[in-house]
UniProtKB/Swiss-Prot annotation:
Gene Ontology BP, a term: proton motive force-driven plasma membrane ATP synthesis
Gene Ontology MF terms in the entry: proton-transporting ATP synthase activity, rotational mechanism
Source species: Crocosphaera subtropica (strain ATCC 51142 / BH68) (Cyanothece sp. (strain ATCC 51142))
Protein name (record): ATP synthase subunit a 1
Keyword Chloroplast set for record: no
Major location category of this protein: membrane
PANTHER family listed in its UniProt record: ATP SYNTHASE SUBUNIT A, CHLOROPLASTIC
InterPro entries, per database record: Alt_ATP_synth_F0_Asu (IPR017692), ATP_syn_F0_a_bact/chloroplast (IPR045082), ATP_synth_F0_asu (IPR000568), ATP_synth_F0_asu_AS (IPR023011), F0_ATP_A_sf (IPR035908)
Pfam families listed in its UniProt record: ATP-synt_A
Compartments (UniProt record): Cellular thylakoid membrane
Amino acid sequence: MDITPDSIIYWQWQWINLNATIVFSWLVMLILVLGSWLITRNLSIEPPLSRWQVALEIIVEQIRQQIRDASQQKADQFLPFIGTLFLFITMANLLTIFPVYQSPAGSLSTTAALALCVFVAVPIYGIKNVGITNYLRHYIQPTPVMLPFNLISEISRTVSLAIRLFGNIMSTSLLVAILISIVPLFFPAVMTLFGLLVGVIQAYVFTILAMVYIASGMNLQQRKTGNHHA
């Protein structure tokens, strides 16, 4: 039983290797790209709408609503980034119903890459909203002595994002595999559904936390104003 898809090597040449994490990450991206193209190529604003378009609109509206609730801001500016994160992680976990598939989210390299995307997105959105001077100034608030602590806080929450998703997906996969080997009859179907549920929940938690971090970087001006009033 492989703990992480990084340990499954399909091809190797010198220091270059093609492991399950890379292969299945490409597969997930291919499915999302092709699926998006197939669903959106015949979009219509006139009824009757296709079932695929109705399903797509429901998903997009739910993501938009969650973004609004988490950020208290207009959702459209965040929808491409947050929506992509959610759909990638969700699809990566849902495909575990296929026996040979290994979720890329079970690899620390994948979750670290996703967390790094969030780490980069936070200052981009923050600078866009409050300006580069105000954004950089918040690192030395309320005193310049706090600079190293604020930097550590930024890094630590990025690390926690990566480890949380990796740990939950990996531990769930191991638990399901162990229980299926012990009770090989009806139990596998139940545990597979449990694994899918956990995968969707973890995708939701990751993207909501990402949105909260981004929103916190954009609300610096409001916090500054609030401190002056206090």
